[in-house]
């Protein structure tokens, strides 16, 4: 496949991810998780593309970190031609191996669509069990313990290799970050490659996943602002459905340095984005790069580059946690 990009600005966000990923219909979550027990919820969206009614079985095979089969529940589904149905399986698990940066234990859910004993489709979904919470008093809590995020913004390119997301280059980048003492990374400022997130899951690197560098106000002549009004929801949905099974992702971002956040015009856009994120995944907090008039819909209030005197004291009285980047002014 040959791709040619026109209108490349000096700081381009364009790149190439060589693998197509189309299996976005399985969502694995672990609500009520703890070291003693957890509930694994597997939601599978099934589409009947046949011309007649179908009765199928949705089967999920749960494999432990060592590959041992733990359970194999199933659910019968009947649906009409063209109908889309969500099958929900809830699986109880005792004494799960918790995922963390120091011990990134991964389970696998193999979801199969069966009819008359024949496998029609199969998707394998790696996932981790890790209770995630946040509070003003303690900040981000992973597996019940406060975690200080030590990391930085990492763009999608691979140095002299350019913006092609070669799997080994993505893995090496994550390994270098972890060996340098990072425990977290912010994806700046567009969707990372699946290979990058897979490596973060395996190595144990926490991720702030962030989709947009512009909304409606352009930063460059030919940037994404031309398409944002018509495409933001489709692109955001694609990122969330693709990435939400990664245990390494602990936070969603909705923008980077957007001019609109300083104006009242940005507030309804931020609310639209925040509401859409929560409709697809309510298990993680939201944030944005740059504080401003739009911070109402988010849980984590950022302080990007500087914190002016008095700001810390004022925000500490709210229900939002401050995330500081680069510099605190005094």
Language-model features: locations:
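Substrate-binding/catalytic cleft of secreted carbohydrate-active enzymes
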Residues: 174-177, 184-330
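Secreted/periplasmic carbohydrate-active enzymes, especially glycoside hydrolases
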Residues: 1-194, 199, 203-207, 235, ...
């Amino acid at each position: 496949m040959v791709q040619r990009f026109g209108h490349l600005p000096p700081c381009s966000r364009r790149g190439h991810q060589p693998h197509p990923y189309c299996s976005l219909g399985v969502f694995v979550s672990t609500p009520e998780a703890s070291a003693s027990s957890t509930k694994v919820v597997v939601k599978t969206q099934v589409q009947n593309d046949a011309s007649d009614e179908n009765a199928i079985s949705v089967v999920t095979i749960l494999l432990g970190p060592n590959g041992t089969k733990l359970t194999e529940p199933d659910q019968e589904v009947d649906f009409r031609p063209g109908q889309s149905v969500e099958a929900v399986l809830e699986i109880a698990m005792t004494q799960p191996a918790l995922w963390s940066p120091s011990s990134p234990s991964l389970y696998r859910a193999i979801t199969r669509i069966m009819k008359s004993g024949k496998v029609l489709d199969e998707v394998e979904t790696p996932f981790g069990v890790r209770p995630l919470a946040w509070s003003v008093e303690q900040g981000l809590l992973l597996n019940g313990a406060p975690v200080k995020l030590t990391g930085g913004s990492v763009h999608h390119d691979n140095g002299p290799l350019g913006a092609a997301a070669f799997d080994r280059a993505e893995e090496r980048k994550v390994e270098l970050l972890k060996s340098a003492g990072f425990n977290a990374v912010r994806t700046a400022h567009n969707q990372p490659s699946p290979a990058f997130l897979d490596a973060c899951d395996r190595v144990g690197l926490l991720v702030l996943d962030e989709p947009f560098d512009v909304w409606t106000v352009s930063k460059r002549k030919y940037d994404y602002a031309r398409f944002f009004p018509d495409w933001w929801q489709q692109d955001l949905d694609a990122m969330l459905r693709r990435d939400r099974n990664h245990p390494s992702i602990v936070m969603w971002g909705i923008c980077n340095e957007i001019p609109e956040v300083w104006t009242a015009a940005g507030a309804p856009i931020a609310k639209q984005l925040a509401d859409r994120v929560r409709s697809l995944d309510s298990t993680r907090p939201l944030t944005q790069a740059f504080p401003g008039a739009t911070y109402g819909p988010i849980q984590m209030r950022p302080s990007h580059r500087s914190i002016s005197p008095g700001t810390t004291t004022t925000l500490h009285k709210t229900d939002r946690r401050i995330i500081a980047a680069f510099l605190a002014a005094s």
